[in-house]
Amino acid sequence: MESQKEARTLQEPVARPSGASSSQTPNDKERREGGAVPAAAALGAEADDDSADGLWELPVEPAERRPECTRCSRPQKVCLCPFLPAHPLHISTHLYIIQHPAEENKVLRTVPLLAACLPQDKCKVKIGRRFSEERDPELSTVCRKSGTLILYPGAEAANLEEFILDSPVYPSTIIIIDGTWSQAKDIFYKNSLFRHPKQVQLKTSISSQYVIRMQPTNRCLSTLECAAVALSILEKNNYIQETLLRPLQALCSFQLQHGAQIRLSKEHLLKNGLYPKPMPKNKRKLRKMELLMNSVKI
């Protein structure tokens, strides 16, 4: 069959008009198999191609970013500064945010709001995936201090509230990783520097108010919420948590008023048969989904 087709093709060559597209519609193909293409059709195809080629020559203007507020990093039309404290909160704890590079340019990120509420010398953001003593000697020094904690859940993590009651050295610094859960896991386990600080976690039953972004489970909190709870515990001041959550609440409220939808956790969607995507074939990912459905901490 293939040889017959090749022979027929060689015996009946079809001339393509200059400038015609190499792609063929079904009608083009039928006309070509029946004989020569009519002159009017050929001219029409050539004219269409010429006009399409002209579109590629039109100048393209780069999209302009909306002017951003220098304090909250939000577009000026939706500035959240009215919901920020008039002056940075007075805290004694140093906060280090280890931010995955993919989070840096996300529109609805929470770290700029957090940084806008705190003194610059108390809140530092380090962007990257790999850190070492050579690359970041400051962070290396911080990680080796006895008063430094790193907030990351796990079997070896102590509950923050219980830890500070028995700790001989009261914590002076806390490190929080900013990124998706898979990104945070990658940063935590692939940087040996983060083995030095005491690992702690939050023992809280509150649900995330960051409802415009899907979380893996009902117990997961955004970076801003984690910092708000942790700082209120370390500073023994609940007003800190209330103040830090105010701009986050305003952000979510504004987005919901302008078309955003409440994003339920993946755990909730799976348990209620609402998860829109097919279950993964990868055994490791499938096992993770099963743990979420059974409310097992992962």
From Swiss-Prot:
Motif DXTW boundaries: 178-181
Family listed: Belongs to the TDD superfamily. DTWD2 family.
Protein's UniProt name: tRNA-uridine aminocarboxypropyltransferase 2
InterPro entries: DTW, DTWD2/TAPT
One cellular component (GO) term of this entry: nucleus
Low complexity bias: start-end ranges: 35-45
EC numbers, comma separated: 2.5.1.25
Keyword Transmembrane helix appears in the UniProt entry: no
Keyword terms: Acetylation, Cytoplasm, Nucleus, Phosphoprotein, S-adenosyl-L-methionine, Transferase, tRNA processing
GO molecular function, one term: tRNA-uridine aminocarboxypropyltransferase activity
Region of interest called Disordered, as start-end residue ranges on this chain: 1-53
Keyword Cytoplasm: yes
Residues recorded with modification Phosphoserine: S132
List of residues that carry N-acetylmethionine: M1
Top-level taxon of origin: Eukaryota
Organism in which the protein naturally occurs: Homo sapiens
Function summary: Catalyzes the formation of 3-(3-amino-3-carboxypropyl)uridine (acp3U) at position 20a in the D-loop of several cytoplasmic tRNAs (acp3U(20a)). Also has a weak activity to form acp3U at position 20 in the D-loop of tRNAs (acp3U(20)). Involved in glycoRNA biosynthesis by mediating formation of acp3U, which acts as an attachment site for N-glycans on tRNAs. GlycoRNAs consist of RNAs modified with secretory N-glycans that are presented on the cell surface.
Pfam families in the cross-refs: DTW
PANTHER family: TRNA-URIDINE AMINOCARBOXYPROPYLTRANSFERASE 2
GO biological process: RNA glycosylation; tRNA modification
Catalytic activity: a uridine in tRNA + S-adenosyl-L-methionine = a 3-[(3S)-3-amino-3-carboxypropyl]uridine in tRNA + S-methyl-5'-thioadenosine + H(+)
